[in-house]
Amino acid sequence: MWDALDTSDKHLAMAWALAPDLSPTSAFSHVTAALIHGWPLIGPAPARIHVVDWKLVGVEHRVGLIRHGIDPAGLCLGPSRFDGVPVVDALGTAVAVARTCDPAVAAVAIDHAVRMKAIDRKVFEEHLPPPASRGGRRARLVATALDPAHESPGESYFSIRLVQLGVTNIHPQHEFITNGFRDRVDFWLPDAGVVVEFDGKQKYVDREMLAGRDPSEVLWQEKRREDRIRTHREVRSVIRVTWWHLESLDRFRALLRSHGVLITP
């Protein structure tokens, strides 16, 4: 049973197991709180549970547990509890994740919260620490990539990767109108004249997305759609990006450069 769980489920199971032994001044926080809130996590979940404790000064590392000291005046708890233990609210969780996690991991998780309206992007930005503080620059980089128009973790992942490469003029869910057809693309990069589509396998195998159509018919319609988009004079190229491209920043950079997207060193 345990081996069948993914790392996120194992992390939550460990949090549940540790809950009875936590002090009454503790609350689940950071990535642990993000998983409790139901936010997606790319890559493996951490091996240790995160909590804040308003009676602790500094950070304490234990086997399977990291305790973060926090000023109780700055602690906001959400309405939910996990096995009786309070959980830091969505906004506080987002700020902690943005400061401490890899930018791609943080952006995918927090963008989901923005998309689900669990947090407001502007309010999130207002609560970020100064750039010179620990994790401040990282958190602001993450904030730049957030957009409620992103429709999936893949699009969130793509957006933060672009930001990490210095591409900032990004238009998600842009529409091209051709002879009465309204074609919406995942991303439009007007400075480069490049359309980017996140090319996941799901659209060809998911029954709901297929809507009774044969996968070959969906593929044919995608080709016709792309042909219409390419008729626009401002469109120089159409890039299809997969999860594999995004997993390596160097690989993604090479793909963009091959299509004429200017990436500064």
Question: Where in the sequence are the language-model features?
Answer:
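Short gly/ser-rich loop at a beta-strand->alpha-helix junction or flexible surface loop bordering the NTP-binding
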Residues: 1-135, 171, 264-265
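Surface segments flanking catalytic/ligand-binding clefts of nucleic-acid enzymes
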Residues: 114-265
